[in-house]
Amino acid sequence: MTVRTRFAPSPTGFLHVGGVRTALFSWLYAKHHNGQFILRIEDTDRERSTQESVQAILDGMAWLGLNFDEGPYYQTERYARYQQVAQQLLEEGKAYRCQCSKERLEALREAQLAAKEKPRYDGHCRNQSLPDSGIPYVIRFRNPDAGIVSFHDEVYGDIHVDNSELDDLILVRSDGHPTYNFAVVIDDWDMKITHVIRGDDHINNTPRQINLFKALDAPVPVFAHLPMILGEDGKRLSKRHGAVSVLQFKELGVLPHALLNYLVRLGWSHGDQEIFSVQEMITSFDLKNVSRGVSSFNYDKLYWLNQHYQKSDSPESVANALQWHFEQAGIDLNQGPDLKDLVAVQAERCKSLAEMCQISQYFYTDIIEYNEDAVKKHLRPVVLEPLMVLHERLKALDEWKNDKIQECINDVSLQFDLNLGKIAQPLRVAVTGSGTSPSIDMTLALLGKNKSIKRLEDALEKIRARASVV
C-alpha cells in the first residue's frame, strides 16, 4: 500500500500555525513512508473563500518547503462529481430528499433544547418518497439506525459512538452545493487517501464520515487527530498572541526550517532531542509519538531555535534569507559589505533576521540616525582630541583590516592614557549612531575606510559644535 496523506485548508483567511503543523505532520508521515502528499483546497464556502487566501496558502507552503506531490485540487471544480455520488446514494436508498422548512427545523431545535435534549434532525422526511417536484429540498444521508461506529485514532486510541447519537446529516444543500462532510469523504475516496491527519476539532465528524465511506463501499482511511495549539495564557491561539500566519513569521525574520523544527516539537517527541534537521524529522517521525495533550506556543523557544540556526547554518544560506528583509526596507545592498560577512558577525547578536536587518542598516546607508542619548553620553568635548588623532591614524592606514584598525585604537588609548572603552565607545557612536555594534574593529572593517572616515569627520564636527556651545 502506498501511503497517501493530504492537507486540506479552507481559503477563508491566512494559513495559521495550527494548519501548518497539520500540513507538516501529514507531509512528514508521507515522506517517512515514501508515500505521497496531496494538497486540496476546500473552497466550498463561496462567501468567505478568496483567491488571496489561496495564494497565501501556496506561498506559505512554498516558503516552508512543504512540497506536494499532487494538487492543488479545488472542491469547486468537483461539483459534478459530488452530484453524481449524491444521485447514486438516492437511487440506492442510502440518502433521501428532505423538504423541511427552516421554520420547522428551528421550531424542532427550540423544542428539543427546552426538553433538554440534544438538538438533532428527527427524520421527518426519512420515510417519505418525495419526488423532485420543484419544491426546494436538501439531500440527507440515511444514517444507520442501530449499531456502533468504532475506529482507532492514531492519537486518541479506540473510539466508539452509538449510531443513535448521530442524525441524518445533510449531503447537498438546497442550492445544490455539497456540505463539508460529504465533499471531504468523496475527495478522500477519489484521491485514495490512506491516512487523514487533521486537527481534533474534526474528531466529532469522523463517525459520520466513516458511515458515509461504508455506504459507498469505499475504504475507510486511518485517522489521526492532533490536539490544538494554545497561547501561553492557555487560550486558543489567536492574533492577540502575536503572529499566527505563517507568512507573518517570515516578516518577523524566522527561518523556515526553524519554524518547522519548532512546530514538529509541538505535540510530538523523539526522546529528548530538540534540534532536528528536516531530514531527521522525516526519518524519525511516527504518529505513535504524538501527544494527546494540548501544546502552548512559546515565542521565546521559537526565537531560541531561530538564533541556533542563524549561527549554525552557513553564512551564505542565512544571507540569502536575510536579503529579502533588506529589500523590503528599500536598502541598497551594493552600498555596504557582503551579506554573508555581515551574518558572520551579527548572527549571534540577533534573535531574528528582521532584527539583524534593523540593527545593520547603518552599514548600507550614507546617512545614519544618531541616538541622542548615546551622543550626549559619548560624543563630548573631552574626546575631541583623541578622536582627532585617531582620525589621522586611521586615515593613514594602507591596509583596512581588523588588526590594523585595532592597533590604531590601542595606540591612541595608550597615548592619551584612556581606558580602551573610553575611545572605542565614542568611535562606535560616531560611525554607527548608537552605542551597540559588533566589535569596533570589525564594525569599521565592514563599513569600509571611506565610510568610516567620513562618519568620524561628521562626528568631530558635532563635538566641535557642542564644545562651542559649552
Curated annotation (Swiss-Prot):
Q: From which organism does this entry originate?
A: Legionella pneumophila subsp. pneumophila (strain Philadelphia 1 / ATCC 33152 / DSM 7513)
What Pfam families does the database record attribute to this sequence?
Anticodon_2 (PF19269), tRNA-synt_1c (PF00749)
User: Keywords assigned by UniProt?
Assistant: Aminoacyl-tRNA synthetase, ATP-binding, Cytoplasm, Ligase, Nucleotide-binding, Protein biosynthesis
What Gene Ontology terms for biological process does this UniProt record contain? Answer: glutamyl-tRNA aminoacylation
Q: How would you classify this enzyme at the top EC level?
A: ligase
Q: What role does this protein play?
A: Catalyzes the attachment of glutamate to tRNA(Glu) in a two-step reaction: glutamate is first activated by ATP to form Glu-AMP and then transferred to the acceptor end of tRNA(Glu).
Q: Which catalysed reactions does the entry list for this protein? A: tRNA(Glu) + L-glutamate + ATP = L-glutamyl-tRNA(Glu) + AMP + diphosphate
- GO molecular function ontology, one term from the record: glutamate-tRNA ligase activity
Q: Which gene encodes it?
A: gltX
The UniProt entry's GO CC annotations, sorted and at most eight, read: cytosol
Q: What is this protein called?
A: Glutamate--tRNA ligase
Q: Which InterPro entries is this protein grouped with? A: aa-tRNA-synth_I_cd-bd, aa-tRNA-synth_I_codon-bd_sub2, aa-tRNA-synth_I_CS, aa_tRNA-synth_I_cd-bd_sf, Glu-tRNA-ligase_bac/mito, Glu/Gln-tRNA-synth, Glu/Gln-tRNA-synth_Ib_cat-dom, GluQ/Sye
> Which EC numbers characterise this protein's activity in its record?
6.1.1.17
Position of sequence motif 'HIGH' region: 9-19
Binding positions for ATP? 239
Describe, as the record does, how this protein assembles with itself and its partners.
Monomer.
